[in-house]
Curated annotation (Swiss-Prot):
Source taxonomy: Bacteria, Bacillati, Actinomycetota, Actinomycetes, Micrococcales
Protein encoded by which gene: trpC
Protein species of origin: Arthrobacter sp. (strain FB24)
Protein name, UniProt field: Indole-3-glycerol phosphate synthase
Enzyme Commission number(s): 4.1.1.48
Catalysed reaction equations from the record: 1-(2-carboxyphenylamino)-1-deoxy-D-ribulose 5-phosphate + H(+) = (1S,2R)-1-C-(indol-3-yl)glycerol 3-phosphate + CO2 + H2O
Pathway: Amino-acid biosynthesis; L-tryptophan biosynthesis; L-tryptophan from chorismate: step 4/5
């Protein structure tokens, strides 16, 4: 069993426990009553033909399987406000509890604190989680191609669109990019971390980004340690970067996001 397989199995067990407390029918009622989803596609520059600005998806993450504890984050809402003030286009909130110490309570607190689009960051293995995300006010969900069959990827993508949300469709190989494109993904992430082994290879992004249709929003995931990595991703075709560890471990995340945005814009300007 790979690391990803193990995480997915845990995510399914935890989801089933929640389903015993809150039925799918109840979630659908809550989703129907929720405020309309914010346009994460537009927030990430999807409708901007120039795409001269690098967008930052700033992540709230207490721990990770590869690094262990990262930050205690006693008040995720306060951190989210700092992210928003720094110019984050989207805020990602981990809700997976076993490996990342996240929760839907964290997500709810952040949702009340900021108006920017939110990514409910979890390991989606069932449509229940998609309805759950919308019921809690999510605007964007994560679909990992390696975790899903083609039918699941297609069906989950369609349900996400029907609920007014967008999906960040995560890939790590050329074959997974082909599958994402076949599922009409509009926001495609390239994770330079292999979730089956947790190894990081930053060169993966440059080798794969050229295979993503130009109309898609291209997100570089993992491996951002500082502005040099941001410049590298932006120069290699990224429209956005997803950053977690480098922000939660920084005493001034607001300033760091502004630095990343500026560095990315410079790199984008140099490539065109």
């Amino acid at each position: 069993m790979t690391v990803l397989d193990d995480i997915n199995a845990g995510a399914r067990e935890d989801m089933e426990a929640r389903r015993r407390l809150v039925s799918l029918a109840e979630l659908k009622d809550r989703a129907a009553a929720a405020a309309p989803a914010r346009d994460a596609w537009a927030a990430l520059g999807g409708d901007d033909s120039t795409r001269k600005q690098l967008k930052v998806i700033a992540e709230i993450k207490r721990r990770s399987p590869s690094k262990g504890d990262l930050a205690s984050i006693a008040d995720p809402a306060e951190l989210a406000v700092q992210y928003a003030d720094g110019g984050a286009s989207v805020i990602s909130v981990l809700t997976e509890q076993r490996r990342f110490s996240g929760s839907l309570a964290d997500f709810d607190a952040v949702r009340k604190a900021v108006d920017v689009p939110l990514l409910r960051k979890d390991f989606t293995v069932d449509e229940y989680q998609i309805w759950e995300a919308r019921a809690h006010g999510a605007d964007l969900i994560l679909l990992i191609v390696a975790s899903l069959t083609d039918a699941e990827l297609r069906d989950f993508s369609q349900l996400t669109r029907e609920l007014g949300m967008n999906a960040l469709v995560e890939t790590h190989t050329a074959e997974e990019i082909e599958r994402a494109v076949a599922a009409d993904a509009r926001i495609i992430g390239v994770n330079v971390r292999n979730l089956k082994t947790l190894d990081v290879d930053r060169s993966v992004f440059a080798s794969l980004s050229g295979g993503i249709p130009p109309e898609a929003v291209i997100v570089a995931e993992s491996g951002v340690r500082g502005v040099d990595d941001v410049r590298h991703y932006a120069a290699s075709g990224a429209n956005a970067v997803l950053v977690g560890e480098a922000l939660v471990s920084d005493a001034t995340p607001r300033e760091r996001i502004a630095e990343f945005t500026a560095a990315g814009a410079e790199a984008i300007a140099a490539r065109v």
